[in-house]
Every structure is written in C-alpha cells, then in structure tokens.
Amino acid sequence: RNFKVPFVKLGTFVLLLLILGILASWIFPDFNSLNSNALNTLKLGFSLILVGIPIYLLLEIYYNPDTIIKINDTLAYFTLLLERFILPKSVRKEVLALLGDVKGKKVLEFGCSVGTLTLNLAESVKPNGKVYATDLSEKELVITKKRITKRGHLHVVVIHDEHQVNRVHPSIPHVNAVVSIGMMGYMQDVKKILKEMRELLPYGGKIVFVDYADFFKMIPNVAWLSNDRVIEKIFREAGFSVFVQRKKGLFWNYVYVYGIKFHENIPYV
C-alpha cells in the first residue's frame, strides 16, 4: 500500500552531503594531501559504470519489449544511416537466395525495420505479388513507407504492430513465404508466433530467419538461440523442418534458420 515518507527532500539532500563528505575524507585524508590510491579506485569505479551503462541498455533491448520499441523509435534514422552495416548486402543476397523465386507470390516480412530488405522483396515479387511488412516501431515504419512510396511500390502493405513480440498481426492473410531479420531474439512467445506463421503458409512454404548473436562478443545471447539443436526442436514442434547455420561477422555473428512447413517430421532437403 502507499505511504508517505517523512523528510524526503531534506533527507535526500542530507544523505547526499554525507556521501560526498565520506568521499572527500577518503580522497583527502589530511585535507592538504591527496590519497592517490583512493583516486585511482574512484576512477576505476566510474570507468566500470561507463562500461556497464551500454551493456545494461543492450540487455534491456534484448529482453524488454517496451524498451525495444522506445530504442527502435529513438534510433530509427540512425538505423537508416547504418543500414548497410547492420544488414550488409551479402546477407540480403543470401536471404533472397534462400527464399527462392517469389515472383508473383505473397511474402510476410516479420520485422521490416527501416525497409532495408523490404525494397528487395518488393522488386522480387513483381509484377503480381505482394509484401506484408510488419514492425513494432512506428518511426521505423514511417521511414519504410516513405521509401516504398518514393519507388512506387504500391504492392507493399506496411503494418504497425506494437505486440509483434507475442504474435503475428491478425490482419495478415495467407502467404507463400515468411522472412524475418533480427526478430527471433525479441520474441517473447516463440512457439505461439511460429504456429501462427505456420497457419498462414501452404505445405512446402518457405521460412527464412536471420538473427544477430554474440553481440560485440560479450553480450549473452537469448538462451534458446544459443543452441542449434534447441532451435531446430522449437521449429520442428511448430511444424517446420529447418537448417540452422551460424556465420561470423565483424561485431556480431549471424544465425540463419531456414526451411519449410511440412506434413510430417521429415528432413528439409
């Protein structure tokens, strides 16, 4: 229950003065002399804080849906500026190759970001195909819409879904293929999302997922993405036969998961 704490402002001020006083007496024990060891320890402490802040933010981005949306919105134009670095042309080519011929087909792009891959997909499905591009960041979708409108891609449907970490947007119709970049680590209910995707696909319909792993070689991966067999098992239980491959990058590695919707538990060849 709620309750009032007496002397909140005054108590905070007094406590702050007390802490500063202790620090001062530690660094300047005799007022005229400087304790170099204390100063070095203090510098080390501040350096650890400076290192810890970005690590904390990266962990928040990994695990907290609200933080994911806020960060993605804030960094939308920064993402656009660095899109060739974040999603290199070589990775895009591999994704399109794994997806195969989608000319005239319907493709769901689950997590389109600023439209980096969306533009390639829009060209690939021409002349009679359609791309459904969803994302949880409104600001990133504003950028995506501007880019596809500028190129006259009227066959691309852009959909904002703030609950994308837990579902496939209910307005998505049946599609021929699903592609997703950088979304597996954000999924809060992986099995539910995969089963919803399965319902939208025909038997033999392809899926291609790519995600980032070993961020800056120091950020821990989402647990289920750390083990290839676990990934295969989760996808198999959802009705997909998949391959899992890992490829090295400069600041992170890439996890490729690709395969098909199947009738029975048969290998994807």
Task: State the predicted function of each range.
Residues G204-Y212:
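Conserved beta-strand signature within the Rossmann-like core of class I S-adenosyl-L-methionine
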Residues N176-D189:
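A short SAM/SAH-binding and catalytic strip from SAM-dependent methyltransferases
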Residues R1-F31:
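C-terminal membrane-solvent junction of multi-pass transporters and transport-like membrane proteins
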